[in-house]
Amino acid sequence: MKKSIKERVTMLAMMAAMCVTFTACGGDSDDDGTPQVPTGPTGSTEYVDPCLDFGSSQSHVKEYMSGFNWELNENSNEYTLLYSNAGASVVINYMFIGNGKGLGMVGVTYASGGDSKALGFKAEIEKRYGITMKKVTNSEDGTEYIYEGLATIGGKQVEIIMNCYKQGINIIYALPD
C-alpha cells in the first residue's frame, strides 16, 4: 500500500524524534572538506547537504556518505539508513519506500532551532533550488511554523517541507505521491 506524503512525513518525524542522538549528512557543495555549508548573515548556521539522488539504491547512498566523517547506525535496515557523527546535532534519515525500495524520502533534523537559523536554511534552500518557499502554517503561540516548496532536483519534482520550532528544525525532501 502506497503511503501518502503526510503519512511518510509523520513516520519520518517519529523516527527522527526517536533517533535524536544520531546524525548523518551528505555532500560538500562548497568543497571545504565538510558537508556543512555556512548560511545566514553571520555564517554561523550550518546547512547539511544530504544525498538527494532519488530512486537510488542503499549502496549508492552508502558510497555517497563514505567520504565524510559519519558512521552508519546499527539500527539501519532495508527501509532506512541512519548515520551519526560525534556531535549528534543533526539526524538524517534516508528512507527507501515502495516496491523498488529506491530512495524516496530524506529527512534532516537539526537539534537546535530558532528564527535566524530557520530563515538561513530557508534562504539557502531557495537559492539552491531557485524556488520560493511558502509559509503554510503557524502554531497558535507563534513558536512553530512550516514552509513548503516544490523543486526540481536531479530532474525529479521534489517536495520540500521545513518544520521550524523552538528546539529544532526538520527539513523533509520527498517525491510527491
Describe each PLM feature range.
Residues 20-24:
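C-terminal motif of bacterial Sec signal peptides marking the signal peptidase cleavage site
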Residues 52-71, 116-134:
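Amphipathic alpha-helical segments
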Residues 136-138:
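Solvent-exposed serine/threonine-rich low-complexity stretches and specific carbohydrate-binding patches
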Residues 32-38, 69-120, 140-177:
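Amphipathic N-proximal alpha-helical interface segments
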Residues 26-29:
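Bacterial signal peptide processing site
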Residues 32-54:
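N-terminal low-complexity, Pro/Thr/Ser-rich intrinsically disordered segments
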Residues 2-12:
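Bacterial N-terminal signal peptides that target proteins for export
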